[in-house]
Amino acid sequence: MAVGPVTGMFKRRIVTDFSVTMILGTLGACYWWFGYHKPAARQREEFYVKLAAEKNAE
């Protein structure tokens, strides 16, 4: 009983690897953007608003 040749495995593997890479990269970028960058930028902006208010109060 002969088994036919396996075709399309390389192409399927490349597509799968690319898809998984893009999904994980996007999830990582979203985690960094909303988990680190946005809170840090908000904190920085609040600091400068407070600093400007103190400077204007003088």
UniProtKB/Swiss-Prot annotation:
CDD domains: CcO_VIIa_fungal (cd22888)
Subcellular location: Mitochondrion inner membrane
Chief location: mitochondrion
Family: Belongs to the fungal cytochrome c oxidase subunit 7a family.
Name of the gene encoding the protein in the UniProt record: cox9
GO terms, molecular function: oxidoreductase activity
Mitochondrial matrix-side positions: 1-14
Stretches that traverse the bilayer: 15-34
Membrane topology designation: Single-pass membrane protein
Subunit structure: Component of the cytochrome c oxidase (complex IV, CIV), a multisubunit enzyme composed of a catalytic core of 3 subunits and several supernumerary subunits. The complex exists as a monomer or a dimer and forms supercomplexes (SCs) in the inner mitochondrial membrane with ubiquinol-cytochrome c oxidoreductase (cytochrome b-c1 complex, complex III, CIII).
Protein name (database record): Cytochrome c oxidase subunit 9, mitochondrial
Propeptide residues per the UniProt entry: 56-58
Functional note: Component of the cytochrome c oxidase, the last enzyme in the mitochondrial electron transport chain which drives oxidative phosphorylation. The respiratory chain contains 3 multisubunit complexes succinate dehydrogenase (complex II, CII), ubiquinol-cytochrome c oxidoreductase (cytochrome b-c1 complex, complex III, CIII) and cytochrome c oxidase (complex IV, CIV), that cooperate to transfer electrons derived from NADH and succinate to molecular oxygen, creating an electrochemical gradient over the inner membrane that drives transmembrane transport and the ATP synthase.
Organism of provenance: Schizosaccharomyces pombe (strain 972 / ATCC 24843) (Fission yeast)
